[in-house]
Structure formats: C-alpha cells, structure tokens
Amino acid sequence: MSEFIKTLEILGEKIELGESRTIDFNIAKLYTSTNIEIPIIIERSIHPGPTVLITAAIHGDEINGVEIVRQLISRKINKPKRGTIISIPILNVFGFLNTDRAFPDGRDLNRSFPGNRRGSLASRVAYFFTNEVLPHADYCIDFHTGGASRFNAPQVRINPGDKNLLKLAKVFNVPFSVLSKNLKKTYRTTCNKKGIPIILFEGGKSLESNSQIVNYGVRGTKRLLYYLDMLDSKFNVTNPSRDTVVIEKSRWIRAQKSGLFHLKIKCNQLVEKGAILATITDPYGKMKFNVMAPNKGYIINVNQAPIVHQGDAIFHISTKDNQPKEEEREMLNE
C-alpha cells in the first residue's frame, strides 16, 4: 500500500505530503514540432493514505469522462482528506484533439497495454503510463462511454468472481454493475494482473456531454472516496435510493434488416420477453420489421443511429438479473 510512502516520485518529480502539483507528461510532438503533453494533476493530503488514480479519455472521443474528471478537479473533490488523488482528464490527447477514438496511426490505446517503449505511439504511451504512473495506485477509476452512436446506461464493469470489486461497485452504486471478463491488452487487464482494483465506468455515448451521466460519475466517485475515508468532510454524500443491479449475463441484439431505425424504448428500461424494442423500415414505406426482446431483461445499451445495417449491434440486454422491487422498476423506467 502506498499510504506509507511520504515522498511520491512520478516522471522524475517528487511530491511530498500536503503538496499539489501538475506534471506534464511529454509524449510526442505534432508535425509542427508542437509538444503534446498529458497533464497529470496530483493532490496529496498532509495525512498518509491510499492513492486513487482517476483517468478519462483513453478513447479521445469519449467526452463524458473528461467532464466528470474536470468537475472533480473544479469542485476540489480531488483534494483528499487523507492519501493521494492522481487525476488525468485526458489520457489520449491525440485522439481528443482530433475528436477520434484512436491515435493518429489508428491504434486503440485500450488495446495497447501494458505497452512497449519502442512500439507504436499508442503502445509507448501505454508503456510509460503503466511503468511511471500506475505503480503508485492502490485503486483506479476509469471513465468511458459507448462507442459511435451506442448509448450505455450508467454501469460499472467488473470481473466475475471478484468479491472485492463487487463490493466497490456496490459502493460506487450506479444503476448497473455488469460482470464481464477482461479483454487482452486493456488497461483493466493490466490493473488486474498487478492486483490493483479498478472501477471501469461506462455511461452515455461518444462525442456527447450528458449531464445525467456526468452526475452519476461524480456521485459514484464521491461515494468511493467517502468509503476510503478520503473525501473532505465539506462534501455531502447522498444515500443511494436503491442498490446497483448486478448483471451476471447479457447478450447483444443485432439488426436482422437494414433500414431506418425507430426506437420504441429507453436505455435503462426493464422489458418483457416479446416486447417491441424498435422498428426497422425501408425509406419507401413498404417494409416494417419489429425488433423484439428475446427475453426479459434490462436494456443497458441502445444504438441511437437513425440508420442501421443488417448485423449491427442495436441493443445490449441482460439475460440473467436480480429483479427489482416495484418502486425500483418505476425509477429505472424514468
């Protein structure tokens, strides 16, 4: 545990207890020789404690996470009562500049971990982050959104069978906690291999700033910091109105036809088997195809594209869930 370390050293700079520091992680240059830097904002209490690492924009087009971390910094939630909070609002600066998910070479940073110091640009960023920043963390929070036009209900993703992570997910308490296996070369997998608990938050869609999603992320972070006895006493933590729903299994529903896509339900909604989720029509008024729920479950992702192709992922639905009480069901359907 880092709570016994008085002097924190990141990228050659030493930060003592009680200090605030912003370190610019210089990763590369633009074609114009302009430096590209990743600001790392470090806040240390005078009182020792754990270190929480908060990151966003591993994918450069995922704006909700950037706004969540910005609010944490702006509202000084990142100034801990004890311990250290390291905040990186934009990890993929190249992608953010281009409002693009990937790096300029098309590489996905979240498929490049733990990285290689002589590899692609994305791999180099992953390498230096993994070796220079991540080792200081006792807990990680990583903010994401759905890709393209796919809107994610507020959820955290955790490894099946990890009781400690499930406990932290229940503390974070967004509507859903989805049990999902780690993918190779992801940040989450790297944390898992190093034994660092990570809460991966998903909410909303790319290239959008959604105030409701942002509020879920900010409130969840406050709850987790409060649980770790790191949240300053000037901040209030509201008791959640309901427990997170644990999604043990889920599946994607794919479009059986190509055409105009008309949604009939909302993300977050609990639907019955056979419920009409959407219709797909041709542009000429001759074809209409109903997309029906294959089972009872929660809709945790909705494709909001106006046009879909056959085979496109259009809904993510739970196939095994904890059924809510009646009043909780009403809240989910709001």
Segments (PLM) and residue ranges:
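Structured catalytic-domain cores with a bias toward divalent-metal coordination
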Residues: 1-334
